[in-house]
From Swiss-Prot:
It comes from Enterobacter sp. (strain 638). Pfam families: EFG_C, GTP_EFTU, GTP_EFTU_D2, LepA_C. GTP binds at D14, H15, G16, K17, S18, T19, N131, K132, I133, D134. One of its GO terms (cellular component) is plasma membrane. GO terms for molecular function: GTP binding; GTPase activity; guanosine tetraphosphate binding; ribosome binding; translation elongation factor activity. One of its GO terms (biological process) is positive regulation of translation. It is a peripheral membrane protein. It catalyses: GTP + H2O = GDP + phosphate + H(+). InterPro entries: EF-4, EFG_III/V, EFG_V-like, EFTu-like_2, G_TR_CS, LepA_C_sf, LepA_CTD, LepA_IV. Transmembrane segments: none annotated. Its main location: membrane. This is Elongation factor 4. SUPFAM superfamilies: EF-G C-terminal domain-like, P-loop containing nucleoside triphosphate hydrolases. The gene is lepA.
Amino acid sequence: MKNIRNFSIIAHIDHGKSTLSDRIIQICGGLSDREMEAQVLDSMDLERERGITIKAQSVTLDYKAADGETYQLNFIDTPGHVDFSYEVSRSLAACEGALLVVDAGQGVEAQTLANCYTAMEMELEVVPVLNKIDLPAADPERVAEEIEDIVGIDATDAVRCSAKTGVGVPDVLERLVRDIPPPEGDVDAPLQALIIDSWFDNYLGVVSLVRIKNGTMRKGDKIKVMSTGQVYNADRLGIFTPKQVDRTELRCGEVGWLVCAIKDILGAPVGDTLTQARNPADKALPGFKKVKPQVYAGLFPVSSDDYENFRDALGKLSLNDASLFYEPESSTALGFGFRCGFLGLLHMEIIQERLEREYDLDLITTAPTVVYEVETTNKEVIYVDSPSKLPPLNNIEELREPIAECHMLLPQEFLGNVITLCIEKRGVQTNMVYHGNQVALTYEIPMAEVVLDFFDRLKSTSRGYASLDYNFKRFQASNMVRVDVLINSERVDALALITHNDNAPYRGRELVEKMKELIPRQQFDIAIQAAIGNHIIARATVKQLRKNVLAKCYGGDVSRKKKLLQKQKDGKKRMKQVGNVELPQEAFLAILHVGKDGK
């Protein structure tokens, strides 16, 4: 056991985590050169296309160190995006150490910091690595100072490497073996295994990734899930050497996969403890804290026949992604669907794309909203995650919106732009610290503004140099109103949005104008209105298509023309009473773009 090393690779987006893991796999001979491809561990098509890691992946490798010993390395490649920080914290729970990869050109960024603090809270050994030293812009001396200054770990002798060219990667492995402690645990104690991750395989059922904390798990054992008390048979178990390899047992301290023929998706939840049925452990391992979704949106299948498939697909996805929350919802405009909770907008996009690709569904998304805390006039407190659930205005005593604490790291020259952006997003500055050329800014900004498009705007205003990490701070009373959209004086529930009173007239007007462009013209006038309560704040009309009924009257009496025009008018009026308006998918997405043009 003293030769096992469990570690994760943590870093900011694009600092080279996945490339470094490729090199490590190559050096340890996990794959032949023929099977080697860029980003071996990003197995989803989506991950490859976007060039980001979404799911944490684990690999077991054998490394022959300079001291002649052979070490077993279990390592986990983690995502770098804010939205997937939950994946990172789960991976870290299975390790004794972490490689903190920092780009020697870019320096320390917000996500580097956030992930590093997570690792330190879990009391892991953090090994700093300076990557991309082959770049002309690389300045390892400055970055090493930055790491000490901002993160607070000693980086004077940080390993320098270039994952792309492979220079210095063996040094990284040597440092790993030297600095990261071996796992602790008792081989003879009753089995305790932590489920780090699980996914659904159409042939095998639920496949779980486990870290053995105590004891040994053998093939054919009866395994008990501690939270439910269910007993399963361990049919197959093994390790990933990126490829799935079968083993007969997993020993204390190892990380591997397990198949128990669990068909029920909720059979083995992530963060649960597995033990032997004959000789169970006394207590479960401390699991993971539940993450609260920050953004909610309605997802509806385009054709209602897909509803069943959609429900199954969500079930399978939520097994793989423990932070996804969903509950059934019905809308008068869109029929039956689900209200889903996500960790951020990127997470929402990814989930929607995965559903459409992996499960072949066509989906409509409504505009994302955050959770509001509402105190009603009879002193009840309710949480509202959808504009249609908001009680009528005169029943609301106080509406509180969630405030996010945003930590930003940026070069000094962009400070002015970023502060202007934060103020425009109704932010309040709470802290500002200078580290050399970098500035660390802390702002409290309403969550609704952060999740909408703050990240994109922050990147564009700072030419991509600023980085952001945010977390929920508290609820704060605020003057928010619901803007409803009426089409031919009927409310469309899927188009409502909650916004600040000061912005409501602009948002309403902009939304109405957008809708006017998107709704196709019909045989009768369509009135589009935006309203707060019963007060109409904006209106636009999609003009009717009309036939020229006077074309056949050359000359002739004026009363004849009047009669024909009146007849057309009456016909249109009748049509308007019975006609209904088909809304295209783009209309529902129009809300997403309201306020994007710097309003």
